[in-house]
């Protein structure tokens, strides 16, 4: 009898409510350590990041599998928290280890310092997406530590190269280890809560169900090399400039996407006009790089024979990328200019927003933010979600924080950061999601 009482007592202790003060402290310290790992892509060497996750999971008795996908430390990770109902397929919590490069001169602090200042934690990847990765990791660790068994298996999946298209990350894993990712749902980065992006003064929380297609293009112009002191009509630089101007003059995008209609209904019929809301309603083109010149360092007095630029084009779901590029070539209409697609297109339909998981996300958001208007959302940037949507899996973008426009603007920019209070709430929201039955 005494032994039975001890067993029952230990079970009750194991399943107690988490000590959230302790969880918050652990989560913040972990994020600081994670931000101090410069997992920049290129080269996407994610070994140190993967080892950090593996060590934290091991502390609570969870095994992490590491998958080497490339020769330069490109490591993907999978860990599984077992659930009760084995008839249900898992929920995949997906995040990525890699981050984009930084312009150190433009930061007021070390971008890989994990610095806490002014109520925020600063560093490359804080928003995209190491902060969310730690929310997912801490939700899994906390469930295990406190003896809480989820309804279904939870698979934590961290990838090495989302920032370069996922060829060694999600695509590689789906090709080589598909059984590890045989799931019913995927939860990724994407939607977020805001009071000043969709409509000022109104708390709207988006769950992303669709995103624009990245169509990265290289435009190359050819000309005649010459001495800079003697201008010529066949100057590759001038040809490139004219081609870019014509390329950027893209026609209107056409009819409204159904997800945008849902977002408009959520905000009362009209969204504020800003770079985010403008981008999600039309095809966009951004000139991102220019490359020209001869020599290293480049000689000012030499007219080069070639010049090139890259355009980051983002197309609405359903837009035919080949037709878009063909129309661009026709506008340029110059045999000296080539337009080349340099990325893989992932055009997939929107994920349904009537699933049990979507309703669970809505319920969790409303529990923590009762005044929030919850809506499906389209995002202008790309994630790894379409690679699962292409296979028929519902994939949702869920960034469980309320973020301001200035904070959102730090993604892929300088002084990247997230508010610490929202980070802590995000850990609890992620925990509530994976603890739920859906």
Where would I find each of the regions flagged by the language model?
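Sec-exported extracytoplasmic/periplasmic mature domains
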Residues: 32-40, 54-63, 141-145, 178-179, ...
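A glycine-rich helix N-cap at a beta->alpha junction
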Residues: 175-192
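N-terminal helical capping/dimerization or prosegment-like subdomains
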Residues: 16-104, 306-310, 322
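Sec-dependent N-terminal signal peptides
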Residues: 3-12
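Second-shell loop/turn segments in exported
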Residues: 17-21, 36-44, 121-126, 226-230, ...
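Acidic, glycine-rich active-site loops and adjacent beta-strand->loop/helix elements
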Residues: 97-99, 158-166, 189-194, 225, ...
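Metal-dependent amide/peptide-bond hydrolase catalytic core
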Residues: 14-16, 192-431, 435-438
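Active-site metal-coordination/substrate-binding segment of hydrolases
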Residues: 87-158
